[in-house]
Amino acid sequence: MAESMVTDPIYLDETAKANGAKLDLLNATMLGVSASLGVLAKAQTGIFEEMDYNAIKAVVDAGSAPITFPTGTQLVNTYTGKDGKAYDCPWDVVQPDDTAEGESGATVPAMVLQMHYATLYDLQFSAYQAFYVVPDGGLVAGTYNVKMGLNWGNNVKTDAVYQFTLTKAAPAGARLTGFYNAPDVVPANWKVYVYKDQQKSELLETCSVTAGSAGTNLGTFLAKENGDLNGLHPVGYGDNRWWKSAYRQYLNSDAAAGAWWQPQDKWDMKPDQADTLPGFLSGFSDDFKSALSRVKVVTYGNGVTDDGSAVVTYDKIFLPSLQEIYCSPQVSGEGSYWPYWKERTGAKTPQALWQTYPLRITRDLAQRTVGRNVRLRSANRGGGSSAFHVGSSGGVSTWTGIIALRSAPACKITKLA
């Protein structure tokens, strides 16, 4: 079934007036391409007309998107929640004049769309990561210890040693997790959890942690991976790297609940919501899903648990970066700025981090007066566990990977396969 489009840019009333001339030109342009579009989207407030995504892609590929779909235009489709309730889902044209690179290396014209409202459901960027993979042969019942090789927050101190006791053997391939929120939780409240596998199909044991060096040493914790131990940053608060995030898998899947998540490395653990949320794309029509292409997305590492270099992924749906939403990035190169956000905020230069901007508030798809916290894909380069987000009051700051938030994701409309 074809989707719907509204051509009025609603992001600011003033912008609607300023774009009047553009919309007149839009109307004229659409007359010229109506044979291929099959319909005419009239440039009048509140007019919705059915559109064909193949026709939209043809306009983009011809280089006509900046005239036909100026910044702020909305393409409106339908999103159906897991309860079967359907919502009009506007996508803002945030950059009508872009390019996209496919997995083959081909580069084509592209138009960038971003959801105007926040997604319906909260999701962790990343679960707490495992700190130890039980080797072949398993771990026998007994006492084990780990040493701290870093200072972190109030409670992680270099050279401190902590022990825990397994009351039964842990099988090969089991994952040890724990030390959750370590810098902010007193050691007396730390725990170690033994899971059968990365899917957390069975919690085999929960162990108390105490100060002490009894038993077998498993290694020394650093912020990053060290020997047989994962880095304490992603262990304590989740991972902040887009390439391995649960959020990336969720946004790019239409699989049923329980079927869209797979571990991305040996430390990765299933997020809490994976068994109850279907993949994000499951809420859209086949027409919309078939219009999406995997495009090159660049995201930098954090410089703590990795070397901080750029990582390339190919995604149909992706979270925006700081740079794309016209904020001052910690590192340049995660895309180019989208003019929508410059116009929406009225900013003359990219806006500073750690400040609050009410014009950046993203509201809920179902409750359109309610502001939501929305994830970005940019990692906080000062640590291995926090990624940026825009808060429900418009603040631009970070939150740890394990916190479940909404998002306002983006996609690129192109002629790529």
Model region roles, listed by residue range:
Residues M1-L31:
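Short, low-complexity N-terminal tether/leader segments at secretion or assembly junctions of large
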Residues G20-D24, G142, V161:
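A general secondary-structure boundary signal
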Residues L31-Y132, D136-G138, N145-G153, K157-A417:
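Collagenous Gly-X-Y triple-helix signature in extracellular proteins
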